């Protein structure tokens, strides 16, 4: 399965959204939302970056999450995205200090 498809499905399930609801919230017509999201999740079609941005916004994940090759990196990307700027700066400083040891 293409990594985008895997990440999309994981994020959708975590958000407790149906394929149809996610599609509608991302601006896809109600009549085709479910089918189109299914095609994205199965890797049959690839969304353009504009759609990726809309999906990311609805799912509260950064666009980079969808393209992270491994699960640990994907988790780090999401965690950093969901904390505020001060917490992110502190996490980065801690990480830099740890890596320089």
Where are the model-predicted features located?
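Alpha-helical residues within the helix-turn-helix
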Residues: 13, 24, 57
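Phosphate-coordinating loops and pocket residues in cytosolic domains that bind phosphorylated ligands
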Residues: 39, 67-68
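Interfacial/linker helices and their anchor residues that mediate assembly or domain coupling
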Residues: 70-101
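Helix-turn-helix DNA-binding elements, focusing on the entry/boundary residues of the two helices
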Residues: 8, 19, 34, 49-52
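A short, Lys/Arg-rich alpha-helix, primarily the initiator
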Residues: 1-14
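Short alpha-helical DNA-recognition segment
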Residues: 16-39
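DNA major-groove recognition helix of helix-turn-helix/homeodomain DNA-binding modules
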Residues: 44, 48-65
């Amino acid at each position: 399965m293409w990594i985008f498809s895997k990440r999309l499905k994981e994020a959708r399930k975590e958000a407790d959204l149906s394929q149809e609801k996610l599609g509608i919230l991302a601006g896809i017509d109600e009549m085709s939302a479910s089918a189109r999201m299914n095609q994205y999740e199965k890797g049959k079609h690839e969304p353009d970056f504009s759609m990726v941005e809309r999906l990311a916004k609805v799912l509260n994940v950064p666009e980079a999450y969808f393209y992270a090759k491994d699960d640990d990196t994907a988790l780090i990307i999401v965690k950093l995205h969901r904390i505020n700027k001060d917490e992110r700066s502190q996490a980065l400083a801690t990480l830099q200090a740890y890596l320089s040891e």
